Amino acid sequence: MLFKRGTNHVQLLRPAVVSDGIIRLGGSAVEFYKQLFQSRIDSEDVMKFVPASGAATRMFKRIFEWIEEPEKHANEIAQFFNRAEELPFFEQWMSKVNELDIETFKVGLESQVKWLRILVSSDGIGLALLPKGLIEFHQYDAHVAIPVEEHMHEALGYAKSGDLCKLHFTVSDEYIGSFMAKVDELKKESPFNEVQWEIKFSSQEPKTDTIAVDPKLQIIGSNENPLTRPGGHGALLHN
């Protein structure tokens, strides 16, 4: 079994550095390739490919540990809440807290744990259940952007051929509708409404999923119906 045998790792000789594996382009070379790209892009079929099927579970892993053993992590939790109001999704979070009539997190550890549950659970705003592409991520002066929006901005910079900008997102089946709705909403806003968009979505092939095992390498579930998780590197080559 692969879990027991392991995989063959690449044998690294040394780190890549400038002049040994890495070429550093000078000012004139940078300008040359920049102009070459700009002169060719309108005649090429360019698409930006974005793997966006990852859930935010690992992003909030630490918070689940805090909720499980709050007394053990009281200092970490306190430090987190010292700057919680700087988080880009704080307004969304606080709105849900107010809706549920929860006391301020400044009361102490018990209230802080309530806030944390609201942050990650389905009873609250459930950010740990969402794909990272739909989470409020970047705070600007008068605007909070999600990663999908940032990828659209980036595509305008280097993936626009003529008046057409192409994007392809890989997302989980569960959230394709949410992604499509958000993209349709963004396309109506400036500067996205100044170009034509061709945005497509696909899902990761189930046949690339990895079988889950316990610490003793026993399959979780049954041989006929094992528990699987989406595969990692290389799983999106088909997409």
Label for each model-derived stretch:
Residues 12, 17-239:
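Domain-scale recognition of functional cores that engage charged ligands
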